[in-house]
């Protein structure tokens, strides 16, 4: 399995809805609202790096009110 953390910047006052939408995506293991530079953080997993890339680019980044993401791929 391939694992990553995804950090999200979202539109103001949309955190709760985006969190709900992120948690509904297959491959998302956990997700939380956070304080600081980013608004949400999620831990994701996929069988391959290709699937991990698709999970981020075709699903998570397409959620309404997501402005930017930062993906941290775990290596150990």
Predicted regions and their residues:
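A compositional/biophysical signature of low hydrophobicity enriched in polar/charged and small residues
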Residues: 1-76
